[in-house]
A protein has these predicted regions:
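Acidic, metal-coordinating catalytic segment for phosphate/diphosphate chemistry
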Residues: 1-28
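Short, well-ordered strand-loop elements centered on a beta-strand within folded domains, enriched
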Residues: 1-3, 29-37, 121-125
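Nudix hydrolase/Nudix homology domain
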Residues: 7, 47-49, 53, 88-172
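A residue-level structural signature of the nucleotidyltransferase/glycosyltransferase Rossmann-like core
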Residues: 13-14, 33, 133
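A glycine-rich, hydrophobic loop/mini-helix early in the fold
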Residues: 18-56
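The catalytic Nudix box helix
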Residues: 35, 52-89
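Active-site micro-motifs of SAM-dependent methyltransferase domains
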Residues: 41, 73, 143
């Protein structure tokens, strides 16, 4: 493949790979996911709740390397490879205008699950990327994210990968 900038990939809709990390926990018998509220300065979906952590896979990197890097950069979580569980991939494809510019996204997202204790008060948020974080009930987000695009920009394909992974783990 060729090396292109993030800006060019989204200006021209060039296919690329991303790493998505979903932080989960069980509370009172229900699965919760940690969502990040995107910074108001983001070039897409500013101020919306999104995947726990995500980012482009850099040239020469493997998806797992990028996932570990994004967790550290965005949330200050120093994870080791054994703590990230590969759950699958899904495509993202859309074009939408933000801040007066077209944003075209054509990506394959590699999904990882992080199911370790997380104290949100101790996270070190990358303020250019992340405004805040909040725990949500997984099923509630699945129900609401399509109807409430004013609040959530969570990719539904990612939620499906997470749910399938959890179903598989439950029956294993």
């Amino acid at each position: 493949g060729q090396i292109i900038s993030r800006e060019k990939a989204h200006a021209e809709g060039i296919p690329h790979r991303t790493a998505h990390i979903w932080i989960i926990r069980e509370k009172e018998g229900r699965v919760q996911i940690l969502l990040q509220k995107r910074s108001q300065n983001k070039d897409s979906f500013p101020g919306k709740f999104d995947t726990s952590s995500a980012g482009h896979i850099q040239a020469g990197d493997e998806p797992l390397e990028s996932a570990l890097r994004e967790l550290k950069e965005e949330l200050g979580i120093s994870a080791v490879p054994e703590q990230l569980h590969f759950a699958g991939t899904f495509p993202i494809s859309f074009a939408k205008e933000f801040h007066g510019k077209m944003f075209r996204d054509e990506e394959i997202a590699f999904v990882y699950i992080f199911n370790e204790p997380v104290n949100t008060d101790e996270l070190i948020l990358q303020t250019e990327e992340v405004e805040s974080v909040q725990w949500f009930d997984l099923e509630e987000v699945c129900e609401k994210c399509e109807k409430h695009r004013d609040i959530f920009c969570v990719p539904t394909g990612g939620l499906e990968v997470v749910r399938k992974y959890l179903d598989k783990v439950k029956t294993a």
